[in-house]
Amino acid sequence: MPTILRVGPYRFFFYSGDMEEAIHVHIERDDKIAKVWLDPIRLHSSGGFSRSEISKILKIIESKREAMMEAWNDYFGN
């Protein structure tokens, strides 16, 4: 589970078995885990996060999207 970014209480990561899926990132805080597709950016599952937190998370992803996609491609060799 490579962690690609930490911002405040949020950990952004993907699972090593995620290679077969479209490019995405998982976001974790405490016992909550959301999933967001990166191309284009869209919420897949909110994992118990509130709407306001999802909004914050999506803004972080928008600002870091290129780096997240690069980390995915570096890890999976795409």
Model segments located where?
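Generic preference for hydrophobic/aromatic residues in regular secondary structure cores
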Residues: 4, 43-45, 64
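Detector for methionine-enriched segments
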Residues: 1, 19, 68-69
